[in-house]
């Protein structure tokens, strides 16, 4: 739901790596094309697109306290993280419409599927059909048997960061050593398939609240929860109209970085064992490293398409990533210790007030850190030896196949990947139209 495009320098960096036509000025029209912005038209926003983007319908007392504390620590208030600059603290924008979640399925599919398309569901795609250097179709199966769908022009892979490289490898397209280790015949050697996995690493500081103003209070009290639900149903405001993650502040983790590389997110709730809400009022301040050094991998587990791939994130493998996580956690703590935020803190639950050294904080990062599920990069766009697709999203060395999803990002964007993934879909669709219809 959170809609943060990233920084202009992210996309200019793509172009600098050889991804022609993917600089910020080139991708901005596709961000605008997809958007139906509640605020209306401006230099950075548009209306009439399929994706509804809105502000949170009500301000929260904890969000206001978070902004004020962040301001005292040097982060100015930012009314629009998708505007001129990402620097500062403010409320996030979300993909909602009338205070309800608005997905890309809502915007692009419902009531809009053309009559000249057949959608097949509940099937497993097993492999691509590769004939004389060209992808000519896909093999798929369901409970009744195995079939082949033939392509007269090209096959578009949009299986996501985990399954797009998996499908290529199942088809014999990838690193020779990986394929041969799984007894898959090499059809087209491409070293970068499944490499370059990137994600945002998050680590939280968790607090018991001194006042009953968090989402936990709604889950732990039937009357409060019921009243909040009625408020939402009648007026589309209140905590049920928000996603629980009210606010962000974007900061530099150190003086060595020239633009924000940490996203600190205020979450108006906290969880305990098995991610169940704690039985008391609490909140979390999550530090997220948004430009990581580490690179992971996604590779097939076997030649059986029904098996899930092997995913290795390699979080905290570099000194830079360790330092950023520690500094981000320290900043989250500083926000909680700064008025007016400090007035809502009864006790630090995690890491705990006794954890003060960098070594202790790093151990907390290792034991409590998590993936933010912003996974990208495993079919990297570019011109180097580990790139998988070119700037037109066509797989290197093959005809008749493109990859159009978040896996093509050469480097992860500095924010939630939702908006950038939608932009890639829009730009990729236009490339297909340009190549076949013009």
Regions found by a protein language model. Name each.
Residues 78, 118-120, 185-189, 265:
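General small-molecule cofactor/ligand-binding pocket signal
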Residues 30, 128, 137-228, 233, ...:
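Glycine-rich loop(s) and the adjacent beta-strand/alpha-helix scaffold that form part
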Residues 15-135, 139-141, 204-226:
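Conserved redox-cofactor binding core of oxidoreductases
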Residues 1-15, 172:
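Periplasmic solute-binding protein
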Residues 23-26, 163-189, 322-327, 418-426, ...:
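Classical protein tyrosine phosphatase
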Residues 28, 34-83, 90-91, 210-213, ...:
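FAD-dependent oxidoreductase catalytic-site/capping-region signature
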């Amino acid at each position: 739901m959170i809609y943060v495009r990233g920084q202009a320098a992210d996309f200019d960096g793509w172009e600098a790596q050889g991804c022609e036509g993917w600089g910020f000025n080139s991708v901005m029209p596709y961000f605008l094309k997809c958007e139906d912005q509640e605020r209306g038209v401006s230099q950075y926003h548009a209306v009439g697109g399929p994706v509804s983007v809105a502000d949170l319908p009500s301000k929260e007392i904890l969000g206001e306290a978070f902004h004020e504390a962040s301001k005292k620590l040097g982060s100015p208030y930012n009314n629009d993280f998708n505007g001129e600059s990402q620097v500062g603290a403010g409320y996030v924008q979300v993909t909602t419409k009338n205070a309800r979640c608005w997905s890309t399925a809502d915007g692009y599919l419902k009531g809009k599927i053309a009559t000249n398309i057949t959608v097949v569901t509940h099937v497993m795609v097993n492999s691509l059909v590769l004939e004389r250097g060209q992808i000519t179709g896909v093999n798929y199966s369901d409970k009744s048997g195995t079939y082949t769908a033939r392509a007269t022009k090209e096959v578009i892979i949009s299986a996501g960061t985990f399954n797009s490289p998996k499908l290529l490898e199942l088809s014999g397209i990838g690193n020779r050593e990986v394929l041969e280790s799984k007894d898959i015949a090499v059809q087209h050697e491409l070293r970068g398939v499944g490499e370059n996995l990137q994600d945002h690493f998050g680590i939280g500081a968790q607090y018991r609240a001194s006042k009953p103003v968090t989402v936990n209070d709604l889950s732990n009290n039937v009357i409060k929860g019921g009243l909040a639900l009625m408020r939402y149903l009648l007026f589309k405001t209140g905590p049920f109209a928000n996603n629980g993650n009210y606010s962000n502040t974007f900061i530099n983790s150190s003086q060595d970085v020239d633009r924000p590389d940490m996203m600190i997110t205020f979450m108006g709730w906290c969880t305990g064992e098995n991610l169940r809400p704690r039985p008391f009022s609490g909140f979390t301040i999550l530090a997220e490293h948004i430009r990581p050094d580490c690179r992971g991998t996604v590779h097939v587990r076997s030649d059986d398409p029904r098996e899930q791939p092997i995913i290795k994130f390699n979080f905290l493998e570099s000194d830079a990533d360790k330092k950023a996580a520690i500094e981000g956690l320290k900043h989250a703590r500083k926000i909680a210790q700064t008025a007016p935020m400090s007035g809502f803190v009864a006790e630090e639950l995690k890491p705990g007030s006794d954890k003060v050294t960098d070594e202790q904080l790093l151990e907390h990062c290792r034991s409590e850190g998590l993936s933010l599920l912003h996974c990208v990069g495993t079919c990297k766009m570019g011109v180097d030896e580990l790139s998988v697709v070119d700037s037109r999203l066509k797989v290197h060395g093959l005809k008749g196949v493109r990859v159009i999803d978040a896996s093509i990002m050469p480097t992860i964007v500095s924010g939630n990947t939702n908006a950038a993934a939608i932009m890639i879909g829009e730009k990729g669709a236009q490339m297909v139209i340009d190549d076949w219809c013009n």
